[in-house]
Amino acid sequence: RQRQMCIRDRLIGKYMGKTPKKGKSYSWVPNHIQDANGELTPRPFLKCFSFASNEMIKHSDELNDLKEDHLLVPTYLQGALVTVSEDRVKELTSEEYQWLTELIDRLKGKTMLMEKDEFLEYLTPDLWSEEKKDELPGRTKQEIYSVLLALGIIMETSDSRVNVPEIYLYGFGLKRKGGIRRPK
């Protein structure tokens, strides 16, 4: 863990901003790309740094903004999160969870956190096309909800609202009330 912190500090610095207010860089990336079950897969983790690096190359004039011997400006990591999320959702929907595409279309533009009852209405099996109904992981909206929970795509808060972690938020076309605008 200590070595990982040291590497991350050298890449982007100790903090995601000038002060600890925006978070420590060591925990920021995993906290923002883990699913609702706290699982972190290597591909999105690595892609976050890859996408951020590619943006740094495109904006080489900002290399002068780098502090000391750092390699990345933290805002590029924050911006990469949007692309990583979109990429992760494409992976899911192109592989074994193609039924999610119609749910994504229904949820696009909605704001999280959402009341559970409202969210469940988007899961009503009758809303899916006949073709996709056969792919659904359940016959009721509650069964589909349970699968989304198990997959880590959604989480339920203590006050029974539904939340979506950032690894899926942007790929689903969702917004977060009071959320910060991500750089592109």
Residue locations for each model-derived region?
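C-terminal leucine-rich, beta-strand-based interaction scaffolds used for sensing/assembly
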Residues: R8-K184
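Short, small-residue-biased leader/transition segments that mark boundaries at the very start
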Residues: Q2-I7
